[in-house]
Amino acid sequence: MRTNFEKFTKRDSVVNEQGEQWQERRDRMKKRHKQQRGNSQKREWN
C-alpha cells in the first residue's frame, strides 16, 4: 500500500512539472499568435 502511494505521488509530481511547462509554452504561443495577427492587419491596412 505504501509503495503504491509513493509511486502515485511521484507520477503526480511529474505531471505537475509537465503542466507548468505546458502553461508557459501555451502563453508564449498566444503572445506570438497575437503579434502575427497584428502584423497581418497592419499589412492589410497598408
UniProtKB/Swiss-Prot annotation:
Domain of life of the native organism: Viruses
Name of the protein in its database record: Gene 1.1 protein
Signal peptide bounds: none
Keyword line: Early protein
Chain intervals for the UniProt region annotation (Disordered): 1-46
Entry-linked InterPro entries: Phage_T7_Gp1.1 (IPR013232)
Function, in words: The function of this early gene protein is unknown.
Biased composition annotated in UniProt, kind: Basic and acidic residues: 1-14
